[in-house]
């Protein structure tokens, strides 16, 4: 059996999970997430305050993988509607700063013009000390994608380390020209 897939997902008190055929809906204090699982190899059911993901055929290797994947996605949905997710980014460089304009994010990262990143539905930006950016939301995948879009505006370069990086990310530095 899949080690992750066989574990049940516990449903907290304030969270409601419903399953209709392939559609799983999770409602909680922070919002509502819906995901469709179009996989015939696993079934999802809610029983005794837990979500159980079961394989249709025990011997199928793909079914084991999909069981673990489905369980992890449902667990992330439950976590998102209860606590939410956040990714922190930091800006390194002289004159690099960020401002929040309404819901959107304005970045000044060494270009001749400021770069504006529009917040998608369900995403919230926070700016701390003009050089730290926090991306928050209830959908783990969406938060990660928005953080990657912000980072892609000015990726960290290996010579001086300037750019936008994830908090705690280590940038391998190069030596540069010698002689």
UniProtKB/Swiss-Prot annotation:
Checking InterPro entries in the record gives:
Ribosomal_uL6-like, Ribosomal_uL6-like_a/b-dom_sf, Ribosomal_uL6_a/b-dom, Ribosomal_uL6_bac-type, Ribosomal_uL6_CS
Matches recorded under SUPFAM superfamilies: Ribosomal protein L6
Query: Which Gene Ontology BP annotations are present?
Result: cytoplasmic translation
Instruction: State the coiled-coil residue ranges.
Output: none
PROSITE patterns tied to this protein: RIBOSOMAL_L6_1
Keywords, in A-Z order: Ribonucleoprotein, Ribosomal protein, RNA-binding, rRNA-binding
Biological function? This protein binds to the 23S rRNA, and is important in its secondary structure. It is located near the subunit interface in the base of the L7/L12 stalk, and near the tRNA binding site of the peptidyltransferase center.
Stated family: Belongs to the universal ribosomal protein uL6 family.
PANTHER family named in the record: 60S/50S RIBOSOMAL PROTEIN L6/L9 (PTHR11655), LARGE RIBOSOMAL SUBUNIT PROTEIN UL6M (PTHR11655:SF14)
The record describes its quaternary structure and partners as: Part of the 50S ribosomal subunit.
Q: HAMAP family of this UniProt entry? A: Ribosomal_uL6_B
Identification of the protein by name? Large ribosomal subunit protein uL6
Species this chain originates from: Halothermothrix orenii (strain H 168 / OCM 544 / DSM 9562)
> What does the record give as the organism's lineage?
Bacteria, Bacillati, Bacillota, Clostridia, Halanaerobiales
């Amino acid at each position: 059996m899949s080690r992750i897939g066989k574990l049940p997902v516990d449903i907290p008190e304030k969270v409601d999970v419903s399953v209709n055929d392939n559609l799983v809906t999770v409602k909680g204090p922070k919002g509502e997430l819906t995901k469709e699982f179009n996989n015939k190899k696993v079934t999802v059911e809610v029983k005794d305050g837990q979500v159980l993901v079961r394989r249709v055929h025990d011997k199928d290797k793909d079914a084991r993988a999909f069981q673990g994947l489905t369980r992890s996605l449902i667990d992330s949905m439950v976590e998102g509607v209860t606590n939410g997710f956040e990714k922190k980014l930091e800006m390194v460089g002289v004159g690099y700063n960020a401002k929040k304009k309404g819901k959107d994010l304005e970045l000044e990262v060494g270009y001749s013009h400021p770069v504006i990143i529009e917040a998608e539905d369900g995403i919230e930006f926070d700016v701390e000390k003009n050089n730290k950016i926090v991306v928050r939301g209830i959908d783990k995948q969406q938060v990660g994608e928005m953080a990657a879009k912000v980072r892609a505006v000015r990726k960290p370069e290996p010579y001086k380390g300037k750019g936008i990086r994830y908090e705690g990310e280590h940038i391998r530095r190069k030596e540069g020209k010698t002689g």
